[in-house]
Amino acid sequence: MFANSGVASTAASFSSFPTVRKPISERNFKSPAIEKAIATFKQKVKNEELGWLFGNCFPNTLDTTVFYSEKDGRPDTYVITGDIDAMWLRDSSAQVYPYLDFMSEDKNLQRLIIGVINKQTSFILKDPYANAFYDDDTKYTRWNSDHTEMKPGIHERKYELDSLCYPIRLAYGYWKKTNDASPFDAQWKKAIETVLRVCKEQQRKDGNGPYSFRRTSEWAIDAVPMGGVGYKVNPVGLICSTFRPSDDATIFPFLVPSNFFAVASLRQASEMVQKITKDNVLADELLALSKEVYNALQTYAVVNHPKFGKIYAFEIDGFGSAYLSDDANVPNLLALPYLGGVDSDDAIYANTRRFVWSEYNPYFFKGSYFEGIGGHHIGTDMIWPMSLIMKALTAQDDEELQRCIQMLQKTHAGTGFMHESFHKDDPKKFTRSWFAWANTLFGELLWKTFNDWNTNHLINQCK
């Protein structure tokens, strides 16, 4: 289960920090703007270990996971997760999103990100119910025997609502940074129409829709009950998600964090469609669905907890059943403000945040030094660095932010990188040594903290 480096993971254990980043000649993509940021961070941050980690983690997506080409004269970028040679709509969006701020200094980086947008558009049009794809339609997938409509070029066909939201977030972020509408052509508009269709199908007002999924597996997290469509829901306006961002099956199909994400993404898509394509009918439909989902969340997703008061449930069925928990994968309840789902001063979110970071969340784990959220995917006592990163990115005060960074600094187990998960009492027991999303997200956190004059001093106070 564990990838074990066998190296202690405290700052005191290192007399120096070895070179673990790929040599320049072996890097998949080179960005002068990112190299400049790394040099600036290392020069001005006194904490040598954090400088080393930033230099390794922030460029990891570019160094190791992106494959740029041009198809029919248009940028086309395939982005693998790291140790899995497949492109997840979710991961690929999150992996390159932190680079948006650097496009103005690096036009090649901008073209790379246009390529990601174009590739995601083509994948959504291929199958909006799939979560992960190959660049080669002839490549064999181990999931070919899944009982669902597998097509050539699909790695896995788990329907996850957030997989349709992340490409919108990336597209919107790109558009806002550049005011460039060139990637948002007729094909992109068709992809947005497809997203809208799937969201409406998965409101399940007129039956279960066309998607179902069953897998022959010993893992319960892959099991979708009721003939592969999931447990019954009351069609109250929310959107079903058969799987979570962790690729684990939902218990109750209305996955609350993903619905909040959809509220933000549908609103963003509406704005883009209205201003770029001038299709007011489609823009109005997108906005109307966003409002419908938001209102349903406020009506059905809020529960009264005996200790924390009003909080958002993790999953619900619309009949009154609710699952109170949180998972480390994003979108989760912890990350709602980060993704634009709620305002950071939302009172119910504040209560929810305290709940998910407590022993009342069955997947919150606390060791002698480390604490954080894990999930069903890896199991008991395994903390995901992503949860610590997201707690820091939504931090309420300096002490909380600094504590998260200090814990993250001590999780790398000598590898110089973040991992998928680590044991609450022993970071040397970790999963996935090459997980680019966590690396880039950690880099985003450090760069954001470093560049904010309100928090800049905290970087140099970390030990």
Show where each model-derived region lies:
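Aromatic-rich carbohydrate-recognition surfaces in CAZymes
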Residues: 85-113, 117-220, 436-450
